[in-house]
Swiss-Prot record:
Subcellular location: Nucleus; Cytoplasm
Species lineage: Eukaryota, Sar, Alveolata, Ciliophora, Intramacronucleata
Protein name, UniProt field: Large ribosomal subunit protein uL5
Subunit structure: Component of the large ribosomal subunit.
Gene that this sequence comes from: RPL11
Biological role: Component of the ribosome, a large ribonucleoprotein complex responsible for the synthesis of proteins in the cell. The small ribosomal subunit (SSU) binds messenger RNAs (mRNAs) and translates the encoded message by selecting cognate aminoacyl-transfer RNA (tRNA) molecules. The large subunit (LSU) contains the ribosomal catalytic site termed the peptidyl transferase center (PTC), which catalyzes the formation of peptide bonds, thereby polymerizing the amino acids delivered by tRNAs into a polypeptide chain.
């Protein structure tokens, strides 16, 4: 049997990149945030609704309050690279989960190379990256669904090593 590093089924890749922009209120501000995400990703964003009513914050149940977009493939890698350049290719160890995912936030969307528009304003956003190995589709498919083995799961250490090798990033 070949070494684990040479095995094609052991390669780690980006499954998806989710960019979330939570405004906290519906209306014109949320529409502007959706426009920013559409310009960034080239895809139509989806609105998220509040789960509960919180009177002290002025949030009603089912009120639109955030917008997010899911990006896959090469476009996800390009946008992730732009986001990591804003963070100077440095992430904290806390940013990595035990299941092989990581996330980080940026304060201003104009740092990604987008042009500033005074009528739109400035929005911060969260980047969430889901990593996977080939063969994880067996857990998501509709017919003959089965479990992914523990050897095929991505650990926190493997995720950090992948980040360091792919993006030459630092983890502190």
């Amino acid at each position: 049997m070949t070494d684990k590093k040479e095995n094609k089924m052991r390669e780690v890749k980006i499954a998806k990149l989710v960019i979330n922009c939570c405004v906290g209120e519906s209306g014109d501000k949320l529409t502007k945030a959706a426009k920013v995400l559409k310009d960034l990703s080239g895809q139509e964003p989806v609105f998220s609704r509040a789960r509960y009513t919180i009177r002290s914050f002025g949030i009603k149940r089912n009120e639109k309050m955030a917008v997010h977009v899911t990006i896959r493939g090469d476009k996800a890698r390009d946008i992730l690279t732009r986001g990591l350049k804003v963070k100077e290719m440095e992430l904290r160890k806390k940013n990595f989960s035990n299941t092989g995912n990581f996330g980080f936030g940026i304060q201003e969307h104009i740092d990604l190379g987008m042009k500033y528009d005074p009528s739109t304003g400035i929005f911060g956003m969260d980047f969430y990256v889901v990593l996977e190995r080939p063969g994880t589709r067996v857990a998501r498919r509709r017919r003959a669904t089965s479990r992914v083995g523990n050897n095929q799961m991505i650990s926190k250490e493997e995720c950090i090593n992948w980040f360091k090798t792919e993006f030459e990033g630092n983890v502190y």
